[in-house]
Design a protein with these regions (language model features):
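Extended, non-transmembrane interaction/recognition domains
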Residues: 1-2
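Conserved small/polar residues in nucleotide/adenosyl-binding loops
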Residues: 121-124
Length: 124
């Protein structure tokens, strides 16, 4: 099992300070999910803003994998908040499964971005 390498963690922190970049803030992320949970249509623009902000970690050196990993984290959390907001559990998990299966067909980061947009505009 991998353990977080303190030296690597320190180096990433150094690079973030030097480049004056940061991850988006937890409160920014939670605002988006709270809006999703309550069914607020403005969650769409909030999620799109976060996706396009560039304020996210680098999960992979490969841009396509990076976008796919980000999408999986988004759909995973969105599924939980949709359930908390009253969506049927099985429907939420099935929708998540289908989106992740669709993700397999994405060939470019822009394909992933389009799928993310489809996710945001899905309604019952």
């Amino acid at each position: 099992m991998a353990i977080v390498d303190e030296a690597k963690l320190g180096y990433l922190d150094f690079l973030s300070r030097e480049d004056r970049v940061r991850h988006h803030r937890y409160v920014e992320e939670m605002k988006q999910y709270d809006m999703m949970r309550s069914g607020d249509i403005n969650a769409i623009s909030e999620s799109a803003k976060l996706w396009d902000s560039g304020l996210y970690g680098q999960l992979s050196d490969d841009p396509l994998k990076n976008a796919k990993y980000r999408f999986v984290t988004t759909i995973t959390l969105a599924t939980r908040f949709a359930i908390e907001g009253g969506m049927d559990e099985e429907d939420a998990y099935n929708a998540s499964d289908l989106y992740i299966q669709d993700l397999d067909n994405c060939k470019t980061p822009e394909d992933v971005r389009r799928l993310h947009t489809c996710l945001l505009y899905t309604s019952d």
